[in-house]
Amino acid sequence: YGSHEAFTRAFRELFGSTPETVRDARSLNNLTLMEPMIMDSSTALTLASPRIEHHKQMKLVGLTKLFAMEQIGAIPALWDLFNRHAGHIPNSVGPTAYGVSLSFSEETGCDYMCGIEVMDFSDVPADLTARSIPAATYAKFHQPGHITLMRQTIGTIWNRWLPDSGYRADEQACLVEVYAGEFDARTGAGGFDVWMPVVK
């Protein structure tokens, strides 16, 4: 940033308060969790072996946005918007939240959805999107660590597990992130799952 004022303005736009207010409060509890813009996705992690399971079609309601590659670090901001709707979506199946890469390419970026599963699309709020996620066979990985390990986890699955697994990625299906009841959306702790769609 070119000046203290520019930094303060950007900080306030992102977090809704000034750096001075946060410092004086001596607490980060009211700040939105944001992924760093640049994270090391090249370092492999040690992951437990996945479960290979077929999963039925899911109907999800939530928010979608196309992120260019240089904007992927802003995905947590979409979650912050979605979390304001959580608990108020009609026909929801349960509290588990899903992050879905509807499409991904180096050229166009990632078309990403965050949402929850619903029984049907009969009562979708006007400001939310409804999408059907096709049935697929998934390698289901559990990551017990913090949400900031997401990119490293996905990188490990793609670059270390998949080449030696006897499977290949199912390009007709979607990569799915699963945030069950143990996950704390405020702190990013509690662990999460990554479902890699696969075919033999």
Spans of model-derived segments:
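A solvent-exposed interaction/effector surface
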Residues: 2-200
